[in-house]
A protein has these predicted regions:
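Ubiquitin-like/PB1-type beta-grasp interaction modules and other compact soluble beta-rich domains
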Residues: 1-75
Length: 75
């Protein structure tokens, strides 16, 4: 295993970031997973994390992320 890689469970699927962003903060992981940080809500290990905390929230190997994309619409 590459020590620079990060293995995560994202929306129920195993994902590997190789190389992992440095530092491995939630905001950088979200961007590395190709999500728009302005359009998602994130649950990290069972806890919804406010967007203001993303720059300081550390993500570790084996963590669980549920990422929900906000979609506009309606009538």
């Amino acid at each position: 295993m590459n020590p620079m890689a990060l293995d995560l469970n994202v929306n129920g699927e195993q994902r590997r970031l190789d190389p992992a962003p440095t530092p491995t903060t939630l905001v950088l992981v979200i961007e590395a997973l190709a999500y728009n940080p302005q359009l998602v809500v994130v649950e990290h290990n069972g806890v919804i994390v406010p967007r203001t905390q993303w720059p300081n929230a550390a993500v570790s190997d084996g963590d669980n992320l549920e990422i929900v994309t906000i979609v506009g619409g309606g009538s």
